Amino acid sequence: MRQFIVIGHDVPTDPDAVSLADLPGAGRLDVLCRCLNSAFFLSHDLRDNVRVWLVVGDEYAIRFEGSELRRLNPDERSTAALVRGALAAREKAIGSMAANPSPGVYIRTQSLSGLLESVADDGPLVTLHEDGQPVVDIDPSAEPTFVLSDHHSFDDAETALLAAHADRRVSLGPEPLHADHAITVAHNYLDTDGYNRY
Amino acid sequence: MRQFIVIGHDVPTDPDAVSLADLPGAGRLDVLCRCLNSAFFLSHDLRDNVRVWLVVGDEYAIRFEGSELRRLNPDERSTAALVRGALAAREKAIGSMAANPSPGVYIRTQSLSGLLESVADDGPLVTLHEDGQPVVDIDPSAEPTFVLSDHHSFDDAETALLAAHADRRVSLGPEPLHADHAITVAHNYLDTDGYNRY
């Protein structure tokens, strides 16, 4: 299982504040939609060994389960509708119980801190950083959990949390990448067993 | 200069047939918009050494010039508006003269065949194919022109044209990728000098 945690700093938790005609205006929800696209889509197929967590407002964690997803389409607008549908179900998420508004989509009340603790035993936690270890020095057989940020850098509190939880800081290359592009590169590294299998 | 040619088989040449509220319905224009995003965006920067050609209906070639672009944003909807604006200028493209509806965006009357001839001297022409040579066996110092297709495979006529023009068939990995993801992987290969520079 490959996992990607993407932090959305500015996306509103109120679905009524999300206009599908202006995703950049909805706290750059377009960025998170492209991350979902990169995480799940293959040509004419979905990756079923992938789980994505969107952390919205450090208050809700929306989980997308590749093996269960049925209504994900590649375009940003329809993906945003799925996220908005999850936010609309947020009041049904009570305590640690998640709501499940559509197949493969779950929302629960959870901060980044709680989420990092809950995935701690799943596999190595990896953050991406320009000064990190080159990805080619990392064992591709591990099933990592990557933590990425939207259009903002990690803030101080997140940086401290990640310093406490992350097993590795990794560099994917000399150019700073958008989060969705980073997901694509990470997948390719793992797909090819570290650029050895084509 | 890195170049990407992306063939849009179903995108209408009439801008009035493009609704920004339904990009998948506009011949999967969403796919081409994501290709532009992958080709040009770095985190907080644009790649100025990149040129993208969208071939629409085998009738028009829309050129995006990284060093000149001013109004490209990452989200699909605003990118689609730029493409629609180019299509709206198509009647000003007369003979081999291109129209230039916005900074860095040009449209001219040209088929795929003519375009492949016009870029023949720019660098090696590369197509992506699951049975192609692993990308890691390719010299990353070349400045290639990649040819990709939208959600459809290359048709028979395109396949014949590419067989005549392409210098290499390359595989980026064992999983079949969307065109925009393939562009991201190709960039990363070149950025890292063949996975050697981080």
Curated annotation (Swiss-Prot), chains A, B:
Top-level EC class as recorded in UniProt: transferase
Residues that hold S-adenosyl-L-methionine according to the record: 128
GO cellular component, as recorded: cytoplasm
Keyword Lipoprotein recorded: no
Coiled coil regions, renumbered to chain: none
Organism superkingdom: Archaea
Pfam families in the record: Methyltrn_RNA_2 (PF04013)
GO biological process terms, semicolon-separated: tRNA methylation
Keywords: Cytoplasm, Methyltransferase, S-adenosyl-L-methionine, Transferase, tRNA processing
Subcellular localization, as worded in the UniProt entry: Cytoplasm
GO molecular function: S-adenosylmethionine-dependent methyltransferase activity; tRNA methyltransferase activity
Catalysed reaction, written as an equation: pseudouridine(54) in tRNA + S-adenosyl-L-methionine = N(1)-methylpseudouridine(54) in tRNA + S-adenosyl-L-homocysteine + H(+)
EC number(s) given by UniProt: 2.1.1.257
Its biological purpose: Specifically catalyzes the N1-methylation of pseudouridine at position 54 (Psi54) in tRNAs.
Record text on subunit structure and interactions: Homodimer.
Recorded family membership: Belongs to the methyltransferase superfamily. TrmY family.
NCBIfam families found in the cross-reference section: PRK02135.1 (NF002560)
Protein name (record): tRNA (pseudouridine(54)-N(1))-methyltransferase
